[in-house]
């Protein structure tokens, strides 16, 4: 399984995106050790029972938690009566619910901290949760009146190249997102039972549920849902899905940096103790000034001709370095 790493802020433009990616990493820092601990405890109890079938919950407690630190653990029910496949599925639901909480919190934070002050409505949040997102970047988020020519020209290509992602697959990722989101809704609101919305999302997702269309080595999926029957979930598939959530956040972040609202993010990160200087009229020196500004604030470096695109924006606000 892929190891999640902490993200440098320069990997994405917005602080909210960086924090969301780090929160996904933190979720795995909890789930993976918990997975190992559960498997280990089961193996210890299974070996002990093989030697003595008459052991009780009290005996297991003395083996696993001799200092009785955790109260109320029913070892028989948790590690004998409950099959591992059921316990692992509970982990999968826990992780899935966390992934959507992270994504929804990311969208909410972007809206409240940055975009709500630039004539966006609550649609800003909802659009980030549904297929059709690629078109929404053109028709809603980055329209002519909301586009920053300076940030688009200076940063979009740099961040896109650094991401190594295929932006044309975003719609496929969103179909997968909606499929797992409806599964999560069944978990939260329908007692794990499959809804018609889940079946519809499944039918929309299946045509693109291939390694090629998702650019993955293994397709995240759920057993075909049956209306009114419990939804079956595997931890391995949720782990795979988490990679697509990361891609959705990164691709969305890079598209949203092209907005005039993103200029607020760009300048809000200026330290209060920096000295204000006028941008040099010498192109070479101006490039160095802007690159230092970008580095200090943990944005990706600009290169070559792109430096000219942001000069007018920097000049308006002066330059902090």
Feature roles, as predicted:
Residues 108-174, 189:
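Short non-catalytic regulatory patches outside canonical folded cores
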Residues 172-209:
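Histidine-centered, metal-coordinating catalytic motifs and their short helical/loop contexts
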Residues 138-143, 180-195, 254-271:
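Short flexible/disordered coil segments
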Residues 87, 91-94, 168-171, 179:
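Short, glycine/acidic-rich beta->alpha junctions
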Residues 1-127, 205-321:
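Extended intrinsically disordered or low-complexity regions, especially N/C-terminal cytosolic tails and loops
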